Amino acid sequence: MSVRLWDKGGATDAQMLRYTSRDDWQLDQRLLAYDLRATIAHVRGLARIGVLSEAERDALVRELEVLSAQNEAGELRLTEDDEDGHSAIEAALVARIGDAGKKVHTGRSRNDQVLVATRLYERDALDELAENAAAGARALLDLARREAETPMPGYTHLQRAVPSSVGYWAASFVEGLADAIDVVRATRALVDRCPLGGAAGFGVNLPLDRVGVARELGFAGVALNPLASQTSRGIIEAQILAAAWQVMAVSRRLAWDLSLFAMSELAFIRLPEAFTTGSSIMPQKRNPDVVELMRAACSVVQGALAEVQSIVALPSGYHRDLQLTKGPTMRGLDEALATSRLLPRLVEGLAFDRERMARAITPECFATDRAVELAVEGVPFREAYRKVAAEIAALPAGDAAASLRARVSLGAPGNLALDDLARRLDRHAR
C-alpha cells in the first residue's frame, strides 16, 4: 500500500477515502506513463538547480525508467489503496532507493503533477483524433473522385429536391471533417503549454527551470501563471470535448445518411457485410448497428462536454470538484477515437446501387433547373418560379448527368474542387 502524499499520520475515515478517491486510481493507470515521463523531467530540472545531486538524479531517473518499462509491459498496476498514480510513484521510489525518493516531490504539487500528465495524454489523443479524421476525410475524398459523376437525388427536409451526385455528397463530409480538424489542431495548440512548476497554483520558492522541463517534455511553451493553469483545468477539457464533438457531429450526419440510404425502401447504399450484424430471431436481417452506434456516440461526447462544463463553475484556485473532469474527458475522447478509427474502413467498403439512385431522380427534381433556365431566357425569376410550380405535374423527365454538368460554380456538383480539398487535407498531414 502506498503512503498517501498528503497523509500526516492521523486517522482517516476509510469510507470517506473511498468516496473521495472514487475511480481515480483506475483513470490514473491510463495516465501513469505520462506521469512517469513528467517526473523524469522534473527530477532533471531539480538537479539543474541543485536540489538533487547528480547521483540522486541518476538513481531516480534509472528507477523511473524501470517503472516506465514495467508499466509499458503491464506489470505496474495501481490498486485502490494507492489512491492515485502520484502516491504510487513516490512509494515505489522510496521503497527502491530510500531517501532520494522522498525528494522527488520537491517544488511540485499533485495539482500541477496531474495537470501535466493530463495535458500530455490530451495532446496525444488530439493528435490521433486529427489523424483519424484526416484518414476518414481522405477515404471520402477517394469516394468523391470515384463517384464524381454518379447521380443521386439531393434531399432537403428529407424530401427529394434536386439532382445531386455521390461525389458531391461525399465531398460535403470531406470539407466538414477538414473544418473539424482545424478545430482539433487549434485546441491542440491550446493544450501544448506546460503547467509543471506551478505547484499548488501559486508558484514555489525555488528557481525551477520551467522552460527546460517544458522543452524536455516537448511542449511548445510554458503556461505562465500557475493560478491560470489551475483554473484552466476543466475549461481546457471542455474545449477538447467541443473539438471532439465537432468531429463526431460530422460523423453522426454521415451515419444518419448511411442509415437512411441503406434502408430497404431506398437501398441506395449497401454497407459492407462485415460491418453489419444479425437478428437473433429473424434470419434475413443485416442490421446497420455500426452506424446507429456512431450516431449515439456523438451524444456521449456531447454529454461528457456538458458534464465538464457544469463542474467548472468554480471560484479561483484548485477545488477537488476538478477531479471529476477526468472521467468524462477520457470517456468522450474514447468515443471520438473509437468512431474516427472505424470511419475510413466503413467508407471504403460502401457500395452504391446506381440504377436505384437514378430512378429516384423523378421529373419534379428538375423543377429548379427549369425555373433557372426560364430566368436565363429573360423571365423574371419569381415569375419563372410560379410558372414551373403550376406545371409540376407536366414536367418531363430530365437528364441528371446534364443537370450536374451545368452546375459549374465553385464547389457545385459540376465543379467539385476536389483538388482544393485534397490540398487542404495535405496541410494537415504530419
Swiss-Prot record:
Catalytic activity entry: 2-(N(omega)-L-arginino)succinate = fumarate + L-arginine
Gene3D superfamilies: Fumarase/aspartase (C-terminal domain) (1.10.40.30), Fumarase/aspartase (Central domain) (1.20.200.10), Fumarase/aspartase (N-terminal domain) (1.10.275.10)
One of the GO biological process terms: L-arginine biosynthetic process
Keyword terms, alphabetized: Amino-acid biosynthesis, Arginine biosynthesis, Cytoplasm, Lyase
UniProt pathway annotation: Amino-acid biosynthesis; L-arginine biosynthesis; L-arginine from L-ornithine and carbamoyl phosphate: step 3/3
Compartment(s) of residence: Cytoplasm
Family the UniProt entry places it in: Belongs to the lyase 1 family. Argininosuccinate lyase subfamily.
Protein name: Argininosuccinate lyase
Organism: Sorangium cellulosum (strain So ce56) (Polyangium cellulosum (strain So ce56))
